[in-house]
Regions:
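Sequence signature of WD/YWTD-type beta-propeller architectures
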Residues: 1-273
Length: 273
């Protein structure tokens, strides 16, 4: 893998029902760029930068990948933090909820047109901009932890498991690092592939998740990788990671949103999900 660039850190969210992901590229520390990743072609569309702190673990992508809910903070003026809905790869808000402090913001999609909102959405007036088919409801403790497909591991205390979409009993397990290697934002988790009694340590990438075809997606040191792990325990040498994109050289640039980024992706009909 490429040499480390301490100014670039990547995190991504894979849509639950579509081969699309959003990628957050952080660096310098108070700037984040969003990119849309077409997982079928491994092409990326670079979008807007956000000046501020993005809380990636409070964000979610709609099942079809058309909408993003994100939680961010600028910590100045009357609005310290906020939760917003946008169309990837743009941060331009379609709906906006001001917050107070870094606790309780964000949201999770339960369907294409329903959002579970964090506890610090203090102003719902901007929802007048949403189509009538879009619904927002209060935080649901049962929905929030499982929104990205990971669930508590029954085999390792404090770890979370996500089975491969391709089956074969292959599981991606992540657990928090301890000691000096740990990061307070949780992004330096230990990642391990597990199949029965066999284990393959993946180290501490910034992020890892499954594509819908069963390949493993990884982000490390400012780069995105894809890895075919279907037979990793049968033929270990056949599962080398393939570089998808090197995002380290990106520099901030102002970008006006196109017209479609300022409009909801579905109309005012009711009953849409």
């Amino acid at each position: 893998m490429p040499a480390s660039d301490p100014t670039a850190r990547l995190w991504a969210i894979v849509a639950r029902q579509a081969r699309v992901a959003v990628v957050f590229r952080r660096g310098p520390s108070k700037r984040v760029r969003m990119l849309r990743w077409d997982l079928a072609t491994d092409t990326l569309e670079a979008g807007q930068w956000l000046s501020g702190r993005l809380y990636e673990d409070r964000c979610d992508l709609s099942p079809d990948g058309a909408l993003l809910v994100y939680f961010a903070g600028k910590f100045r003026g009357d609005v310290e933090t906020f939760t917003a809905i946008s169309r990837p790869p743009f941060f331009t808000p379609l709906a906006f909820w001001p917050g107070r402090g870094a606790y309780g913001g964000g949201g999770a999609f339960t369907s294409r047109s329903e959002l579970v909102l964090g506890t610090h959405a203090v102003d719902r007036a901007p929802l007048a901009q949403a189509p009538t088919s879009f619904e927002v409801r209060p935080c649901d403790a049962a929905v929030w932890p499982a929104r990205h497909g990971f669930s508590p591991s029954g085999a390792e205390r404090g770890a979370e498991d996500k089975p491969s979409p391709a089956g074969r009993g292959l599981v991606l397990r992540r657990s928090r690092s301890e000691g000096a290697a740990a990061r307070p934002d949780g992004r330096r988790r230990l990642h391990t592939l597990v199949q029965g009694a066999e284990r393959c340590e993946l180290g501490r990438p910034d992020w890892a998740d499954w594509d819908h075809d069963g390949s493993l997606l990884l982000a490390e040191r400012g780069c995105l990788f894809r890895r075919d792990v279907a037979r990793i325990f049968e033929r270990p040498g056949s599962a080398a990671p393939r570089l998808v994109a090197d995002l380290r050289a990106m520099r901030f640039e102002a970008m006006a949103p196109p017209h479609e980024a300022k409009a909801w992706p579905f109309g005012p009909q009711r009953g849409q999900s």
